[in-house]
A protein has these predicted regions:
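Acidic/glycine-rich phosphate/pyrophosphate-binding loops and surrounding catalytic core
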Residues: 2-205
Length: 205
């Protein structure tokens, strides 16, 4: 096996290839957590108090300056709950810098569905935008240097690709997506191998 030299473009491309399936899975899991173990909007008993044919219009506004991330997760939440019955109007794109009190997006659809999906959608937006915003802060501090900001595998379970995508939106770069991407010899590998030399030689041969 030939060791792979770090290539941020290859990491980014690999992430973008995986992300569609991971978005679907992550959203489904989050909705199941709210809806009694299955993706069924009828399990939101509070939303069922509203008239079935009622429709609403909602505007999501940011509370503070930052970097937006999470568009496709928001859309997937409502697609899984209501197919194409929710309409989106987007005022920002992933990676855009936003100001406090700026409208991010608007939703129009069944009132029950908007209320059922609201918290799940916002959880994704807040988490991913928070990561993107913090990454951008450090990237800006490093501007003018040759230093590149990389992420790690220390991510929330089930959200690996989402959080690494947020890093890209903030201007950072991805390191390893998983253990199969590249060798990374750390203290425990050295201890188990017997020496740094043995670990490195094994990686090359």
């Amino acid at each position: 096996m030939t060791p792979r030299r770090y290539n941020p473009d290859r990491r980014r491309d690999a992430l973008l290839e995986r992300i569609n399936l991971d978005i679907t899975d992550a959203v489904a899991q989050s909705l199941r957590e709210d809806l009694g173990g299955e993706v069924d909007a009828n399990n939101d008993i509070s939303a069922q108090l509203l008239p079935q044919d009622a429709r609403s219009h909602a505007v999501v506004i940011t509370r503070e300056d930052g970097v937006f991330c999470g568009k496709r997760w928001v859309e997937e939440v409502f697609i899984q709950l209501a197919g194409d019955d929710v309409n989106f109007t987007w005022h920002v794109a992933d990676g855009d810098a936003v100001k406090a009190n700026q409208p991010l997006f608007e939703l129009e659809g069944p009132s029950r569905i908007l209320l059922t999906g609201e918290r799940t959608a916002l959880n994704f937006v807040q988490t991913l935008s928070g990561v993107a915003s913090e990454v951008r802060r450090y990237v800006d501090l490093l501007a003018g240097t040759k230093t590149q900001l990389l992420d790690t595998r220390k991510t929330l379970p089930g959200l690996r690709t989402a959080l690494k995508y947020a890093v890209l939106c903030g201007g950072g770069a991805n390191h390893r997506l998983g253990l199969s991407d590249a060798f990374l010899i750390k203290e425990n590998h050295i201890i188990a191998s017997g020496s740094v030399r043995q670990a490195v030689e094994k990686a090359f041969w």
